[in-house]
Amino acid sequence: MFGKQDKMDVRCSTETEANRVSKNGHKEGKDSKGAEGNISTSFLKEQQGTFSASAATEDCNKSKSGSADPDYCRRILVRDAKGSIREIILPKGLDLDRPKRTRTSFTAEQLYRLEMEFQRCQYVVGRERTELARQLNLSETQVKVWFQNRRTKQKKDQGKDSELRSVVSETAATCSVLRLLEQGRLLSPPGLPGLLPPCASGALGSALRGPGLAAGSGTAAAAAAAAAAAPAGGSPHPPSAGTAAGPPPPAALHGAAAAAAGHGLFGLPVPTLLGSVAGRLSSAPLAVAGSLAGNLQELSARYLSSSAFEPYSRTNNKESAEKKALD
């Protein structure tokens, strides 16, 4: 009895121990699971905290980098013309803190020597430039820069002079054209004999002035006409006062026309004009003067129509003058 009871007690004890061990194991498993869960949750919380902190620092750095200037830039304050202060960003490579380079001030002697060398040769290089810089107590760079600036100034002055000369020449040409046009517009038949050769101007002037006025102011013209008429059969003696007072004979005008045969007035046949005048002068002096005036008007019209400055004339009667010249 007692032995069986002991066996049952042992079995019960073993079962109870097994149950107890299983219960303890289950509890330990629960505890371990809870501990693992606590560790994981705490680790996740820590990781989230670290991640959020790192993200915050990155965002802060980004914001700082966005607001701050790069290393190669800097900000300066500048007052504008209106008085307001503005902030501008400039690269540090400008080196604004560096003092400005002073301009080289040449003395009168240095300028004189440099100008003389420039007139001699516009390009001074090599040993000549070194020697010139040593004589003038300057550096070669200063001498080189002075010659460069002097060449630039000379080119600029030459451009201005050429423009001025072109303007002056255009103005002079315009003035000369206008003067010629004015002379052509004011050209009258009595003023045309001044353009004739000397041998023909005396006869035409005496014919235009008439027999009465030729005695007072045309003695030289009458003498020339008599000398021209002498080979035609007249006397070789000089003309007297009586003959000078009267109108010149037709033979004299014929001689003047023959003498003027070698001369051409603007390429126009002058002898035919003088021959027609000489043929009519003996019969009626007034009629001769009228016909001569008509011939001179025709001659002046031909001169104006054949002028080289015809395109510049601003006359409304241009077509009529050309038609008259062609007729």
UniProtKB/Swiss-Prot annotation:
Which parts of the sequence are annotated with region: Disordered? 1-41, 230-249
Checking SUPFAM superfamilies in the record gives: Homeodomain-like
What Pfam family does this protein match (any one)?
A: Homeodomain
What is the protein name stated in its UniProt record? Ventral anterior homeobox 1
Basic and acidic residues bias: start-end ranges: 1-34
For this protein, the record's InterPro entries field holds:
EMX-VAX-Noto_Homeobox_TFs (IPR050877), HD (IPR001356), Homeobox_CS (IPR017970), Homeodomain-like_sf (IPR009057), HTH_motif (IPR000047)
Query: Which species is listed as the source?
Result: Gallus gallus (Chicken)
The organism's taxonomic lineage, starting at the top:
Eukaryota, Metazoa, Chordata, Craniata, Vertebrata
**What are the Low complexity biased-composition ranges?**
230-245
Name the family: Belongs to the EMX homeobox family.
Q: Which superkingdom does the taxonomy of this entry point to?
A: Eukaryota
Keyword check for Nucleus, yes or no.
yes
As recorded in Swiss-Prot or TrEMBL, the protein's gene is named VAX1
What residue ranges does this record give for the DNA-binding region?
Answer: 99-158
Tell me the CDD domains matching this sequence. Answer: homeodomain
What the protein does?
Transcription factor that plays a role in establishing dorsal-ventral polarity in the neural retina.
Is Cell membrane one of the keywords UniProt gives this record?
no
The cross-references to SMART domains, in alphabetical order and at most eight, read:
HOX
Q: Which key words are in the record?
A: Developmental protein, DNA-binding, Homeobox, Nucleus, Transcription, Transcription regulation
